[in-house]
């Protein structure tokens, strides 16, 4: 069977926009042991049923266990000619309710969900109150202490630009380089939530959660905003704060060249903000 990058003469490439609640999954990537349920595992099984043969998908960004996505993008190759509804409604009928295909688009053979992407955007949602919320369990991160969003936003500006993010990568990160280009990094409040909104050309493993973990130390008054700049310069993960929980992290956008004609985001009802 050809890999997603080895297109046969009779095959064509399809891109899908996916959203999922990652609460119960062991991340995006298919694992060695099938009892570790992943988003990729369920999606490939569903697409393969519609395509009448085994299908392998490639994604824009591999999310960790417990991380959600409102705009994941994948691609796969198939020799079966199906309409748009087959790749959306047909695949959705085979998926658990926590995973949904939102759109499908035919693409040129050189399109790649990961390597064609210009940027990815994540949002991290937090809330503060005396007790944890039952309604927001695993959908937003809980922090009991008061946070100074002005200091956190000032600290986040140290992330901007192209630089080495060794201090904010996971110990097991397999990327060959820690250089990444952060295009925006904003902290703001909306509807009772504190939101970290960050966009970059690509992200290292655990990078957003590690950034958030250190920003929380600034927001709680334990560190000054300039500390983030110092961490970047020192390039030592052990000096930064612990990794923030995955609960409030969402992949919310993937940007591609205009020629691909793909949505960069998926419109969402502001459910969390309406509660």
Language-model-detected regions and their locations in the chain:
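Structured-RNA-binding interfaces characteristic of tRNA pseudouridine synthases
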Residues: 1-275
């Amino acid at each position: 069977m050809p890999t997603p990058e080895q297109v046969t003469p009779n095959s064509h490439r399809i891109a899908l926009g996916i959203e999922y609640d990652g609460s119960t999954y062991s991340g995006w990537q298919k694992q060695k042991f099938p009892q570790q349920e992943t988003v990729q595992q369920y999606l490939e099984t569903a697409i393969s049923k519609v395509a009448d043969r085994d299908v392998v998908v490639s994604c824009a960004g591999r999310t960790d266990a417990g991380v959600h996505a409102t705009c994941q993008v994948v691609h796969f190759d198939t020799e079966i000619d199906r309409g748009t509804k087959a790749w959306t409604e047909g695949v959705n009928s085979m998926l658990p309710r926590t995973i949904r295909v939102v759109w499908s688009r035919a693409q040129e053979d050189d399109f790649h969900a990961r390597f064609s992407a210009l940027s990815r955007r994540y949002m991290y949602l937090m809330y503060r109150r005396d007790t944890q919320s039952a309604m927001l369990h695993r959908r937003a991160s809980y922090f009991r202490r008061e946070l100074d969003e002005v200091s956190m936003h000032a600290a986040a500006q140290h992330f901007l630009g192209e630089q080495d993010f060794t201090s904010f990568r996971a110990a097991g990160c397999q990327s060959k380089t820690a250089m990444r280009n952060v295009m925006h990094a904003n902290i703001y409040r909306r509807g009772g939530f504190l939101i970290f909104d960050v966009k970059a050309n690509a992200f290292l493993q655990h990078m957003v959660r590690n950034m958030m973990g250190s920003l929380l130390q600034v927001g709680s008054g334990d560190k000054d905003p300039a500390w983030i700049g110092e961490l970047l310069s020192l390039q030592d993960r052990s000096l930064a704060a612990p990794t923030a929980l995955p609960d409030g992290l969402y992949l919310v956008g993937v940007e591609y060249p205009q020629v691909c004609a793909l949505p960069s985001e998926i419109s969402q009802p502001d459910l969390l903000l309406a509660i």
